[in-house]
């Protein structure tokens, strides 16, 4: 580091080149004085603290300055004069990734483009993903339905026995019958995968683009469709339900294997009709979700709004329900988020994507058009959404991805909102504050999925790209800004025809699962008359010591 007296800046002598990181230079009153680095460290820390850097970054920078790597850097950058501080911190974050993320050396680059078709039956799991040092990939199954997307652990995140997956394929009659020969076989929409042996069974058929899926606190599964008329379906006892079929999506008619009306799955018409993906569900039954809509898709219409469903009868307690009629999702009201740049009132004109917000009442059946009519804030394709279980403030923190479009220089982002009163929704009460948390760039862009790592609170951002990457991002520290303190790349998909999706951690934060979605299956056999995807288990994540005590 070089410190110059501002009054004598023009007359300062040239700093000698070739000074190693074993020393620091202090230029003052026309004199160059050489000081041992150790004796100057307290002054360095004091100066960096004055700049407003958080303790983590100060410690990181100081530790790096003491390292042999900086000796080479200091010489190359003329006594640290030319070293870019952002690069300095980024390299340090990567070199100390075990401390901050619990993984070894991160990836320097994404996986190289592959030949097509890439996927074959002979490949092992490591052929599917490039991963950070210390991580290990293995197959859960290679027989999940093609376009396997998001999933929920069952019966819990702590001790899961199954993954309950949404399959994002279109509604399709497969040209044959279910066992028994009476019911036409449609595309798989919701599947369960047994973790002990990788066996796959279909729970529900006949959906359109099943995407967002969550386990509720009352032990049901909520599965949703990413379509302009996308519906939401609640499933009870998902391990005991097989091959049920939606025969009429508009009416929500669902039959079991014998052609009888289903008693295990119901369409929740009180929830908004829209293109669902990310979902956050509180124990009371409040549902947060976004409409995956690109601005301009509809004439003179904004992008997708963020919605909140408030149940008419909020759930009390955490015991499982005995029948679907007991669910808080049976009735309630739907609201769209309207964000303002002003405090206490709604500004005219363009408006803001960040700021303080209120919830505006809309109808469930016409949520998308109503949101545009009442002036709800539109975003660029809201996709995944997660609740922050480690948030300790009042209310609920929910974070979601806006995919953007990298080709247009819109690299996408992660936004986070804090709703101080989840059960409240009033156009005159600005109970929500929204801010950007991660902003995309030329390397990390078009974020699609999102996950919190339990224990650490680290945020994982998953791209919607060929050879898509997964980035681990630190929470915001005590520094001045309100964004992530830095991200590293920990995984990249090797198959150019596929993307990573559905990434989620078990409750201990040490194991994650993901889908290698919509790969080119030319060289792979069909299963149950349908193309397949690989589901991967990633182990080797370590919880940094500071979170263990």
Question: Predicted segment positions?
Answer:
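Gram-negative bacterial Sec-dependent N-terminal signal peptides
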Residues: 24, 41-71
């Amino acid at each position: 580091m070089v410190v110059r007296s501002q009054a004598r800046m023009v007359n300062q002598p040239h700093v000698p080149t070739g000074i190693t990181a074993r020393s620091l230079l202090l230029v003052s009153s026309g004199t160059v004085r050489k000081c041992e680095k150790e004796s100057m460290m307290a002054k360095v820390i004091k100066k960096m603290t004055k700049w407003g850097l958080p303790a983590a970054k100060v410690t990181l920078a100081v530790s790096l300055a003491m390292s042999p790597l900086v000796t080479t850097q200091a010489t190359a950058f003329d006594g640290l004069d030319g070293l870019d501080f952002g690069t300095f911190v980024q390299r340090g974050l990567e070199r100390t990734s075990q401390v901050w993320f619990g993984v070894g050396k991160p990836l320097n680059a994404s996986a190289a483009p592959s030949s097509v078709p890439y996927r074959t039956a002979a490949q092992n799991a490591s052929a599917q993903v490039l991963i950070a040092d210390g991580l290990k990939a293995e197959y859960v199954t290679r027989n999940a339905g093609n376009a396997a997307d998001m999933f929920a652990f069952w019966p819990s995140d702590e001790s899961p026995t199954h993954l309950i997956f949404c399959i994002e394929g279109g509604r399709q009659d497969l040209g044959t019958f279910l066992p028994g020969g009476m019911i036409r076989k449609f595309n798989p929409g919701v599947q369960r995968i047994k973790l002990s042996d990788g066996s796959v069974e279909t729970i529900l058929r006949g959906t359109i683009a099943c995407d967002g899926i969550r386990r509720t606190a009352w032990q049901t599964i909520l599965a949703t469709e990413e379509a302009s008329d996308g519906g939401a379906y609640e499933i009870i006892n998902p391990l005991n339900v097989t091959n049920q079929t939606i025969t009429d999506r508009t009416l929500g008619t669902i039959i079991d294997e014998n052609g009888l009306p289903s008693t295990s799955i119901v369409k929740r018409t009180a929830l908004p009709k829209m293109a669902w993906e990310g979902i956050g569900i509180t124990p009371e039954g409040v549902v947060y979700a976004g409409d995956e809509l690109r601005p301009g898709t509809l004439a003179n219409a904004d992008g997708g709004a963020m919605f909140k469903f408030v149940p008419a009868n909020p759930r009390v307690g955490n015991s499982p329900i005995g029948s679907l009629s007991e669910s808080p999702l049976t009735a309630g009201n739907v609201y769209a988020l309207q964000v303002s740049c002003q405090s206490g009132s709604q500004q005219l004109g363009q408006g803001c994507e960040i700021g303080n917000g209120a919830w505006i009442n809309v109808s469930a059946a016409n949520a998308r058009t109503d949101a545009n009519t009442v002036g709800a804030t539109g975003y660029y394709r809201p996709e995944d959404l997660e609740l922050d279980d480690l948030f300790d403030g009042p209310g609920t923190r929910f974070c979601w991805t806006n995919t953007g479009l990298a080709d247009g220089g819109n690299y996408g982002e992660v936004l986070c909102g804090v709703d101080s009163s989840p059960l409240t929704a009033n156009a005159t009460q600005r109970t929500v504050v929204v801010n950007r948390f991660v902003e995309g760039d030329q390397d990390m862009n078009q974020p699609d999925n999102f996950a919190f790592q339990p224990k650490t609170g680290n945020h994982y951002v998953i791209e919607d790209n060929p050879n898509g990457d997964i980035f681990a991002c630190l929470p915001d520290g005590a520094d001045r800004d309100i964004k992530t303190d830095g991200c590293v790349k920990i995984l990249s998909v090797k198959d150019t025809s596929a993307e990573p999706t559905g990434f989620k951690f078990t409750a201990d934060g040490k194991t994650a699962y993901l889908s290698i979605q919509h790969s080119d299956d030319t060289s792979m056999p069909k299963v149950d008359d349908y193309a397949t995807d690989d589901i991967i288990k990633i182990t080797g994540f370590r919880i940094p010591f500071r979170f263990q005590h």
